[in-house]
UniProtKB/Swiss-Prot annotation:
Disulfide-bond pairs as recorded: none
One Pfam family recorded for the sequence: Aminotran_4
This protein's name: Uncharacterized protein HI_1169
Domain of life: Bacteria
Gene3D superfamilies (UniProt xref): 3.30.470.10, D-amino Acid Aminotransferase, subunit A, domain 2
One example GO MF annotation: catalytic activity
SUPFAM superfamilies attached to this UniProt entry: D-aminoacid aminotransferase-like PLP-dependent enzymes (SSF56752)
Length: 188
């Protein structure tokens, strides 16, 4: 069984944000397994993209446990998400990228006619089912300071100064001009 996973973007044969994924992978292993011995792999060395996929947009999924990994490659088409259904869940915990997404899937099923959900925890906006959220107000982009998962794309955009953290309550959502999903496959 693989309790954790990473999703990486490979665009035209180049792995995106590999260093941030490596850091999160190692941190997640240590947090999940505590003081138990773990085998840490170099993710870059593990990825062997098949030649027919070299010039495509690829979603690479690495499932892992304390001793081994399993890698899968999928062609990917970016989507535009226009509508978000707020769903309240005060007891959700997703600080690690868990393979068991049953609670997230249950919440996603509540989206109704919307494209995606917006998870509200203790009155604050957190994430959606597949990534972090960013909110545009005028020319500035903000991301909730209460994410469920510290995403690698979110971290990259924060480091670059392209987005800023702030508390976003559910009632604040109407004050923004645009909402976007960011994750390994979708940047700003």
């Amino acid at each position: 069984m693989y309790p954790l996973f990473e999703t990486l973007c490979i665009e035209n044969g180049k792995i995106q944000n590999i260093n941030l994924h490596q850091v999160r992978y190692e941190r997640s292993l240590r947090e999940y397994y505590g003081k138990s011995a773990v085998k840490i792999f170099n993710l870059f060395s593990l990825i062997q993209l098949p030649t027919p996929l070299q010039n495509q947009l690829i979603r690479c999924r690495i499932d892992y446990n304390a001793e081994t990994t399993q890698i899968q490659y999928f062609e990917y088409q970016r989507k535009i998400y226009r509508t978000f259904q707020p769903v309240i869940c005060d007891d959700i915990e997703y600080s690690l990228k868990y393979s068991d997404r049953s609670l997230i899937n249950t919440l996603f099923a509540q989206r109704g006619a919307c494209d995606e959900i917006m998870i509200i925890k203790n009155g604050k906006v957190t994430d959606c089912s597949i990534g972090n959220l960013i909110f545009r107000q005028g020319k500035k982009w903000y991301t909730p300071d209460t994410p469920l998962l510290l995403g690698t794309q979110r971290e990259k955009l924060l480091q670059e100064g392209k987005i800023q953290e702030r508390t976003i309550f559910q009632e604040d959502i109407v004050n923004f001009d645009e909402i976007k999903i960011i994750n390994a496959m979708n940047g700003l």
